[in-house]
């Protein structure tokens, strides 16, 4: 993809059988624009979309390969010299443009760790057993930055290779997944390249508020039925949120 702008946010929005990720991407883009009206935002999707919240809507450059296996295409698809890729099912609960200053001297930054809605580091390892069992860095691809560079090209080439040759790579892991998640693939790529080359220290770099049951924690999967949430500002159980909130319940809408 030709470079059209220096910086911008790229939101992959490839629907699954059960999730309308383009709807999620629209909600995320609107939340970013609330704080940064002039931000450049691109959706990456196989669907038609004319929503003006996006500056560009572009297709997958190599076609729909199915689910997570599309992820490596973000490097080829981005129209930016510096890109922040964001998972679609999140909300920007506050300004995030300071990330550019934080990231700009690095070639690749994948976020480390997660927080609960009280802004405490996530302690539960329920969803991260494969990381602990294999000494993988605790990365979350939900926030990933790169600038056009040899390092970024190498990283996403590794991501592609791991997805395409998973039957080989999974033999390197204990208790490997039958189908790899993007976080596991990013973690393997980071470990091969050296985590310090593609991450920032957890206390320095941004990380998501993760609203999964065992992190929050709640009794059920659907936190929206147990916790009280408010808008303007976005608060959960009266606690004001900041940064990016990964709401996880895919059909949740901030503004009803």
Where are these regions (language model features)?
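Catalytic phosphate/metal-binding cores of nucleic-acid and nucleotide-processing enzymes, i.e., regions
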Residues: 15-18, 23-24, 43, 77, ...
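A glycosyltransferase accessory/donor-loop signature
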Residues: 1-7, 11, 43, 53-56, ...
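A structural signal for short, well-ordered beta-strand segments and their strand-loop junctions
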Residues: 42-45, 84-87, 92, 108-111, ...
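GT-A fold catalytic core of metal-dependent nucleotide-sugar glycosyltransferases
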Residues: 49, 59, 69-121
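Short acidic (Asp/Glu) patches
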Residues: 65-72, 120-132
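A short acidic, often aromatic-flanked loop/helix-cap motif at beta-alpha or helix-coil junctions
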Residues: 49-51, 63-67, 116-118, 204-210
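Glycine/proline-rich, flexible active-site/cofactor-binding loop segments
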Residues: 8-73, 227, 247, 251, ...
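Short coil/turn segments at beta-strand junctions that form active-site/ligand-binding loops
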Residues: 5, 39, 80-82, 106, ...
């Amino acid at each position: 993809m030709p470079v059209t702008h220096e910086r911008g946010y790229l939101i992959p929005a490839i629907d699954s059988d059960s999730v309308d990720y383009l709807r999620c991407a629209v909600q995320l883009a609107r939340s970013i624009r609330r704080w940064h009206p002039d931000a450049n935002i691109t959706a990456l999707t196989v669907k038609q979309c004319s929503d003006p919240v996006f500056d560009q809507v572009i297709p997958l450059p190599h076609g729909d390969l199915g689910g997570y296996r599309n992820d490596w295409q973000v490097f080829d698809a981005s129209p930016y010299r510096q890109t922040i890729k964001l998972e679609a099912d999140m909300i920007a609960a506050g300004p995030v443009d300071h990330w550019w200053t934080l990231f700009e001297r690095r070639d690749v930054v994948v976020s480390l760790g997660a927080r609960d809605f009280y802004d405490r580091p996530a302690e539960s390892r329920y969803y991260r057993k494969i990381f602990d069992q294999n000494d993988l860095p605790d990365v979350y691809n939900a926030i990933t930055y790169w600038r056009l560079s040899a390092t970024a090209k190498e990283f996403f080439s590794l991501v592609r290779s791991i997805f395409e040759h998973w039957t080989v790579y999974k033999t390197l892991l204990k208790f490997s997944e039958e189908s790899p998640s993007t976080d596991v693939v990013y973690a393997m790529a980071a470990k091969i390249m050296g985590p310090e080359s593609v991450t920032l220290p957890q206390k320095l770099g941004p990380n998501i508020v993760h609203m999964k049951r065992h992190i929050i924690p709640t009794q059920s999967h659907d936190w929206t039925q147990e916790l009280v949430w408010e808008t303007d500002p976005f608060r959960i159980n009266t606690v004001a949120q900041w940064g990016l909130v990964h709401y996880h319940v895919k059909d949740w809408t901030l503004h009803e």
